[in-house]
């Protein structure tokens, strides 16, 4: 692997000029660079399938800086599938939960229902608060059947992220953060998006944030 500073310059250059070449990506610090630059250049839609927003990666710079900047903008969307809830109380997931709660809307609803009373009906007033959840951030735990579907298509131990419709990072060895990516491959992104959306829209996938 090349010098980390040279690698960062190369990744920034590829992002700026939207090069479609494949970028090798392996090891935690290199993964943090590529993910950080992808968040930096994302225009508003990020799809993430990961183990569970592991803080050892997400909190590594520049990943953490760009991740925070992206999700703090309410115009940006982040949809995520996670295998595990092991890190739900760590910084990345706590921040996602906090932002979602802040953006959710509470509406006070008044309902009138008729209740049978004696020979007639009585009008009864009921008041309640309804929380309308924010939809710019949604994190689901993937259902095992959907995880098997992805493994059947792409192999075991893979995760991937797609930014907008043309940028992606495909991780084929999650334990060692070995991956590759590109800033301009819409055809490959289309297949990954179709796979992600199929799993994400599975009613059995549980919303956790």
Predicted features along the sequence, with ranges:
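PLD/PLD-like phosphodiesterase catalytic module centered on the HKD motif
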Residues: 1-47, 51-209
């Amino acid at each position: 692997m090349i010098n980390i500073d040279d690698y960062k310059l190369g990744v920034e250059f590829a992002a700026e000029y939207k090069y479609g070449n494949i970028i090798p990506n392996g090891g935690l610090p290199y993964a943090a660079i590529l993910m950080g630059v992808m968040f930096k250049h994302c225009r508003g839609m990020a799809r993430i399938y990961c183990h569970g927003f592991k803080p050892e990666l997400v909190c590594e710079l520049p990943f953490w800086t760009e991740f925070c900047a992206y999700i703090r903008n309410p115009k940006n969307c982040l949809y995520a599938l996670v295998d595990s809830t092991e890190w739900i109380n760590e910084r990345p997931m706590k921040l996602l939960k906090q932002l979602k709660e802040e953006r959710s809307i509470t509406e006070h609803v008044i309902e009138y229902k008729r209740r049978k009373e004696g020979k007639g009906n009585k009008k009864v007033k009921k008041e309640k608060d309804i929380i309308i959840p924010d939809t710019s951030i949604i994190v689901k735990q993937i259902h095992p059947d959907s995880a098997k579907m992805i493994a059947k298509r792409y192999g075991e131990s893979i995760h991937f992220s797609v930014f907008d419709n043309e940028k992606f990072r495909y991780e084929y060895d999650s334990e060692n953060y070995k991956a590759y990516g590109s800033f301009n491959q819409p055809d490959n992104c289309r297949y990954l998006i179709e796979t992600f959306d199929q799993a994400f829209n599975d009613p059995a996938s549980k919303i956790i944030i």
